[in-house]
UniProtKB/Swiss-Prot annotation:
Residues 381 form a propeptide. The gene is ubqH. InterPro entries: Ubiquitin-like_dom, Ubiquitin-like_domsf, Ubiquitin_CS, Ubiquitin_dom, Ubiquitin_ubiquitin-like. This is Polyubiquitin-H. CDD domains: Ubl_ubiquitin. It comes from Dictyostelium discoideum (Social amoeba).
Length: 381
């Protein structure tokens, strides 16, 4: 049966239960759905508070009954924490909680490490080892949260697109660290970043202090294409892929980049430029491939063929196979594409059911042949 649980905020939760479930079980289900620990839950039905050891049947709770959920604060209070941005966070606390605990709760909610938090109440900065009671902080008191930057500063990084990134840094951070922070935020590899301040390009080994970069300074980020060029790769489907390359990259590297972007294994790639197939060991420069050149990508099927698999719903699946593939391999490829377990697949060709241990060649299955897929229901044969 289903029952409903209504909270003080007016939200209604639906639970699947049995009459024999005890109240403890019901609280565990509420915890699963809402994350509220059982010891903070009070459940009320027909004006009565329900006891953990009793069952729903004991209280004559039937399908589609509505329980009311009231939160029991263990130490009995809520407090508020206001940030400099004006956001207010609500915390459930006890008078005996120390300031360290409170900072940990703020970290849980907001992700701000405790060592970057300063909490202020009644104009005083609160010390970690003291408790809320020590400072006479009572229910619904408001604390103020100020961020302590360890080295004490924020700087800005402006990109060529006009976007501004804010970073938390210390004067002692070196430029390499700053580039790593930019990579964390924006995903740009450090070796593609050039940082400019006051007209100077910043060197990795130097620190922000070395360049007299102070709080709220703005750096400019310019992207460095390592070898300095972009090329395009056009597929037979008409899709164009953009790659960042260097003239000294060999064709093998280029195929690896295509694999990273598109997932196509290098041994299935043939690259064509100016009518010539490019060889793995040669470089882009060898072929006079320059910035914004377009290569053409043709897929090489290793065993050299495509076959089709038609399902009872009329859907046709295309598979890349080799004549030497056995039927088991083919079923595994169908599983990869369609999620159908091999043991539920029966494959038919030319009126014959294909056996797992045999190969496509055994059945004279050639390129562009069509197999038929019939589902075998596990209970059947």
């Amino acid at each position: 049966m289903q029952i409903f649980v209504k909270t003080l905020t007016g939200k209604t939760i639906t639970l699947e239960v049995e009459g024999s479930d005890n109240i403890e079980n019901v609280k565990a289900k509420i915890q699963d759905k809402e994350g509220i620990p059982p010891d903070q839950q009070r459940l009320i039905f027909a004006g009565k508070q329900l006891e953990d050891g009793r069952t729903l049947s004991d209280y004559n709770i039937q399908k589609e009954s509505t329980l009311h959920l009231v939160l029991r604060l263990r130490g009995g209070m809520q407090i508020f924490v206001k940030t400099l941005t004006g956001k207010t966070i609500t915390l459930e606390v006890e008078g005996s909680d120390n300031i360290e605990n409170v900072k940990a709760k703020i970290q849980d909610k907001e992700g701000i490490p405790p060592d970057q938090q300063r909490l202020i109440f009644a104009g005083k900065q609160l010390e970690d080892g003291r408790t809320l009671s020590d400072y006479n902080i009572q229910k619904e008191s408001t604390l103020h949260l100020v961020l302590r930057l360890r080295g004490g500063m924020q700087i800005f990084v402006k990109t060529l697109t006009g976007k501004t990134i804010t970073l938390e840094v210390e004067g002692s951070d070196n430029i390499e660290n700053v580039k790593a922070k930019i990579q964390d935020k924006e995903g740009i590899p450090p070796d593609q970043q050039r940082l400019i301040f006051a007209g100077k390009q910043l060197e990795d080994g130097r620190t922000l202090s070395d360049y007299n970069i102070q709080k709220e300074s703005t750096l400019h980020l310019v992207l460095r294409l390592r070898g300095g060029m972009q090329i395009f790769v056009k597929t037979l489907t008409g899709k164009t892929i953009t790659l960042e390359v260097e003239g000294s990259d060999n064709i093998e590297n280029v195929k690896a980049k295509i694999q990273d972007k598109e997932g196509i294994p290098p041994d299935q790639q043939r690259l064509i430029f100016a009518g010539k197939q490019l060889e793995d060991g040669r470089t882009l420069s060898d072929y006079n491939i320059q910035k914004e050149s377009t290569l053409h990508l043709v897929l090489r099927l290793r065993g050299g063929m495509q076959i089709f698999v038609k399902t009872l719903t009329g859907k046709t699946i295309t598979l890349e196979v080799e004549c030497s593939d056995n039927i088991e391999n083919v079923k595994a490829k169908i599983q990869d594409k369609e999620g159908i377990p091999p043991d539920q697949q029966r494959l038919i060709f030319a009126g014959k059911q294909l056996e797992d241990g045999r190969t496509l060649s055994d059945y004279n299955i050639q390129k562009e042949s069509t197999l038929h897929l019939v589902l075998r229901l596990r209970g059947g044969n």
